[in-house]
UniProtKB/Swiss-Prot annotation:
Monomer. NCBIfam families: gltX_bact. It catalyses: tRNA(Glu) + L-glutamate + ATP = L-glutamyl-tRNA(Glu) + AMP + diphosphate. One of its GO terms (cellular component) is cytosol. Its EC number is 6.1.1.17. A motif ('HIGH' region) lies at residues 11-21. It comes from Streptococcus agalactiae serotype V (strain ATCC BAA-611 / 2603 V/R). This is Glutamate--tRNA ligase.
Length: 484
């Protein structure tokens, strides 16, 4: 095994980059960069049935958007896709066959299904039973000849050491061990189509690429003993393994599911909605790891410097969409205006709102944004029909002082000339209404805000009125007075 730390992220090109896979990539990336090691991308594309066109491009594109870079990948190195490494796998299959550590199995899917059904009915744990048990060499040869004559294509199975103990000290969970007798019998390392199974190919790849540490989700724990068997059969040293805990939905407490519609689970979704990649990177980094302390906002460089594998959580990581949005808002409101406007611009353009007021509108709503696509509904006031009031807003407008406030403020606006109507002259007009009527606080400001914008909350009221314009503001107030 290499002395230098070398880790890998090895996705299957079967769809979009999920938040769980993004976390796996990110933790490997942070670990490598913190220790001055190598971060390798390898594509595991041996499951041809689930292969999605453009799946590989999508994975790499979204990793790059998150801000990760890598030292080796299919983009720069040959044979970094499993489909390009079939000769290498075959070489080791042949070696294990020659050494008697693996054998060709001619049992059919129908026979396997029937045996599983028998075992389940008998209350036995399903397992593969070697089809050659009890056969003499002559009987074995006759059986193989008969099966091959019938056109049955064999798989290749690894001969499992039933008395073996397969254990490792996990980077996250500590000591874990499995008994060879609980693995389910001899298992397939090469399918009928000639492709290796995952648990075989991944060992060959990790050894060939000198991977020193394998950091992945704890759904892979059950795969680890099988992989250790292959390392043992080939006489190789295994890497260190670390299995991160599940990601659960913070609302349900259950494993995060693609059916959870209250969460954005694919990195592509965050890109399309105009989240800042730095915010998503920061949020994912804290799913099952934290550096200690109360601080939660970290740059990529800070996260690399702070990353400590000993602080990986042993408890499930809670995915909280509200926290993601809080963090995203923190990034957006503190980002430089040019970056935020660049994120908002495509959404404004698509909505036909890229007017001479566009920059002012983005500046106005920047403190509220959780994602750039929100700029369109937030600016409806300036482009769309006046919104219907909510019950809470109607309750505010039912107060007996509201007509007095609105009429007085309308008069103040009308009295301003076009030159006098500026952002800085609006607040003094509101204060003048307060002085004249004796009405103050939310009884003063809330009716004006609702009458002008149709909302109880929003940006600074003078900013909203100024961007809306004197004429439209007066029109909105007149319309509201007519409804009271």
């Amino acid at each position: 095994m290499a002395n230098k730390i070398r880790v890998r992220y090895a996705p299957s090109p079967t769809g979009l980059l999920h938040i769980g896979n993004a976390r796996t990539a990110l933790f490997n990336y942070l670990y490598a960069r913190h220790h001055g090691g190598d971060f390798v991308i390898r594509i595991e594309d041996t499951d041809r049935k689930r292969h999605v066109e453009d799946g590989e491009r999508s994975q790499l594109e979204n990793l790059r958007w998150l801000g990760m870079d890598w030292d080796e990948s299919p983009e720069t190195h040959e044979n970094y896709r499993q489909s390009e490494r079939l000769e290498l796998y075959q070489r080791y299959i042949d070696q294990l066959l020659a050494e008697g550590k693996a054998y060709k199995s001619y049992v059919t899917e129908e026979e396997l299904a029937a045996e599983r059904e028998r075992q389940e009915l008998a209350g036995e744990t399903p397992r593969y039973i070697n089809e050659f048990i009890g056969m003499s060499e002559t009987e074995k040869e006759a059986y193989i000849a008969e099966r091959e004559a019938a056109g049955i294509i064999p798989t290749v199975r690894l001969a499992v050491n039933e008395s073996g103990i397969y254990k490792w000290t996990d980077m996250v969970k500590g000591d874990i061990e499995f008994e060879g007798s609980n693995i389910g019998g001899d298992w397939v390392i090469q399918k009928k189509d000639g492709y290796p199974t995952y648990n075989f190919a991944v060992v060959i790849d990790d050894h060939d690429m000198q991977i020193s540490h394998v950091i992945r989700g704890d759904d892979h724990i059950a795969n680890t003993p099988k992989q250790l068997m292959v390392y043992e059969a080939l006489g190789w040293e295994a890497p260190q393994f670390g299995h991160m805990t599940l990601i659960i939905n913070s609302e349900t407490g259950k494993k995060l599911s693609k059916r959870d519609t209250n969460t954005l689970q694919f990195i592509e979704d965050y890109r399309k909605k105009g989240y800042m990649s730095e915010a998503v990177f920061n949020f994912i980094a804290l799913l099952g790891w934290n550096p200690g302390g109360e601080e939660e906002i970290f740059s990529r460089e800070q996260l690399i410097n702070l990353f400590d594998e000993n602080r990986l959580s042993k408890s499930p990581a809670a995915f909280d969409q509200k926290k993601m949005d809080w963090m995203s808002n923190d990034y957006l409101k503190n980002a430089d205006f040019e970056s935020v406007f660049a994120l908002c611009k495509p959404f404004l353009e698509e909505a036909g709102r890229l007017t001479d007021k566009a920059e002012k509108l983005v500046e106005l709503y920047q403190p509220q944004l959780k994602s750039a696509d929100e700029i369109v509904p937030l600016t409806d006031l300036f482009f769309a029909d006046f919104p219907e009031l909510t019950e809470a807003e109607k309750e505010v407008m039912a107060a007996e002082t509201v007509p007095t406030v609105l009429s007085a403020f309308k008069e103040k606006l009308v009295s301003l000339s076009d030159e006098e109507f500026t952002r800085d002259t609006i607040f003094p007009q509101i204060k003048a209404v307060q002085k004249e009527t004796g009405i103050k606080g939310k009884n003063l400001f809330m009716p004006i805000r609702i009458a002008v914008s149709g909302e109880m909350h929003g940006p600074e009221l003078p900013d909203t009125i100024y961007l809306l314009g004197k004429e439209k503001s007066v029109q909105h107030i007149d319309n509201m007075l007519a409804k009271l």
